[in-house]
């Protein structure tokens, strides 16, 4: 079991119904989506179901990054970065 790191402000979403409600309110189809700090991937799972053009996942925590790699590496439209969100170059998506 992963314990949230309070130093990183981590809180894990556990209820898939809440994740689904969040994603249902957003137009994701054929959009480039950047998800910062996805934690264990509950919202990520719902984003992927909505078929984004590309999903960019940015996770600073090394353990969560490894978990996300295992879950999503084989999905063609998903890129996963182990980096602080402040250091990511967002200008490539303009």
Predicted stretch roles:
Residues 1-94:
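Catalytic cores of RNA-modifying enzymes
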């Amino acid at each position: 079991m992963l314990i949230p790191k309070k130093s990183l402000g981590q809180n894990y979403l556990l209820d898939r119904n809440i994740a689904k409600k969040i994603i249902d309110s957003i137009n994701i189809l054929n959009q480039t989506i950047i998800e910062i700090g996805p934690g264990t991937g509950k919202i990520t799972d719902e984003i992927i179901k909505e078929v984004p053009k590309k999903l960019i996942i940015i996770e600073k925590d090394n353990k969560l990054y490894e978990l996300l790699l295992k879950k999503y590496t084989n999905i063609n439209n998903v890129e996963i970065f182990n980096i602080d969100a402040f250091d990511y170059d967002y200008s490539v998506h303009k």
